[in-house]
Amino acid sequence: TFTMIEQFFPELDSVEKVEVKDGETLDLGSHKLTFVFAPMVHWPEVMMTYESTEKILFSADAFGKFGARDTDEDWACEARRYYFGIVGKYGAQVQALLKKAAGLDIQTICPLHGPVLNENLDFYRNLYQTWSAYEPEDKGVFIAYTSVYGNTKKAAELLAQMLVDKGCEKVAITDLARDDIAE
């Protein structure tokens, strides 16, 4: 890493550098930073930082979302799309990160993408737990289809109606070529 930094910033060649390891803490006086490695929570070299004085987790790509910084909008919709688009295939690594983070007293989460989270943190952690365990958020049936001539669409709609008639309480159907699947 130092070699790469010096290639981009040769003026830092003579500056003192510190290599940190997973779980190490750097005491800066009024702030203490603990480094939490989170490999494959998007990239192999991902590292998060926990600041224990203010109880802030700088979470890198974890707990991020697409869209504006507004926390008044439905966080879960764009966070879900972000999670499954960016880190969704690394559920085991996210599970390991959640276990590490469980031991930290976190009052604020600062992701690289999306709003700073400082209320209802259990809501966000629980969603990440559900997503990373590949568990459904709700019980129901999701029918995804695409149809060039309309025949598959008719079959999908018929199947959806049959499921409702049989008592399935939640049936969602979407045309993968035309609908916004983030919704």
Language model segments and positions:
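N-terminal beta1-alpha1-beta2 submodule of the flavodoxin-like/Rossmannoid cofactor-binding fold
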Residues: L121-E183
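Short, glycine/charged-enriched secondary-structure capping and boundary segments
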Residues: F9-L12, Y50, T71-D74, Y124-N126, ...
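Generic structural signal for helix capping and beta-alpha/helix-loop junctions
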Residues: T3-I5, F66, N118, D180-I181
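Short, flexible hinge/linker loops that cap or flank conserved catalytic cores
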Residues: D27, Y50, Y134-E137
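Metallo-beta-lactamase
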Residues: T1-E119
